[in-house]
Amino acid sequence: MRSGLIAQKVGMTRIFTEDGTHVPVTVLKVDTCQVVSTRSVEKDGYVAVQLGAGTAKVKNVSKPARANFAKAKVEPKKKLVEFRVAPENLLEVGTELSAAHFIPGQYVDVTGTTIGKGFAGGMKRWNFRGLEATHGVSVSHRSHGSTGQRQDPGKVFKGKKMAGHMGDEQVTTQNLTVVSTDADRGLILVKGSVPGHEGSWVLVRDAVKRKLPDGVPFPAGVKAAASAE
């Protein structure tokens, strides 16, 4: 199990294959993604790496966090995320990862926070059909109708689809294809859409339901190695 990457969603565009097929892609940017600290079985009971991405202003970082960054000899980071890894894939503190961590044709899982929609009704939130336009219905055309039974069970069951807050929740989109990568500019192009608005942070991991293809760098795609090639 390898580490993932922290990236920022730039936006969507499209590219054309050699046979002229148009492919919609989401552009993800990897910016100064470094290992800030590590976790070990002896000390923490599990193996993981803590990655940081983006450069934060020192005034916006707490004093304990500043001490951690200083100990790791890395710049203060805007986003910190921990990734579980296999012991043989543990990285040294200060290692900077690049977009070459993934290869074209590979499948990845992307986790992000969806765009918040506020309070939404049943038709928008759950795709309900609504009530009749006529036949005695008035005012309640877009309502979701009945919410339960009668005295027995005498309650609305938990999880009932009703109007409420929509969006602004963590979602993972699985099995997205990596169309291409640009290690020099730190760009990853994945086929299809990714949760979140432009500029939001997303986590990119190897797909859990797909086999890793040959040629994937182990333990990770390090920036120094990518630039040396």
UniProtKB/Swiss-Prot annotation:
Family to which the UniProt record says this protein belongs: Belongs to the universal ribosomal protein uL3 family.
Keyword RNA-binding: yes
Any one cellular-component term (Gene Ontology): cytosolic large ribosomal subunit
SUPFAM superfamilies xrefs: Translation proteins (SSF50447)
Keywords: Methylation, Ribonucleoprotein, Ribosomal protein, RNA-binding, rRNA-binding
General function of this protein: One of the primary rRNA binding proteins, it binds directly near the 3'-end of the 23S rRNA, where it nucleates assembly of the 50S subunit.
GO biological process: translation
Taxonomy, superkingdom: Bacteria
Modifications the protein undergoes after translation, according to the UniProt entry: Methylated by PrmB.
InterPro entries to which the protein is assigned, alphabetical: Ribosomal_uL3, Ribosomal_uL3_bac/org-type, Ribosomal_uL3_CS, Transl_B-barrel_sf
Single GO MF descriptor: structural constituent of ribosome
Pfam family, any one: Ribosomal_L3
The protein's name in its UniProt record: Large ribosomal subunit protein uL3
Modified residues (N5-methylglutamine): Q151
Oligomeric form and interacting partners: Part of the 50S ribosomal subunit. Forms a cluster with proteins L14 and L19.
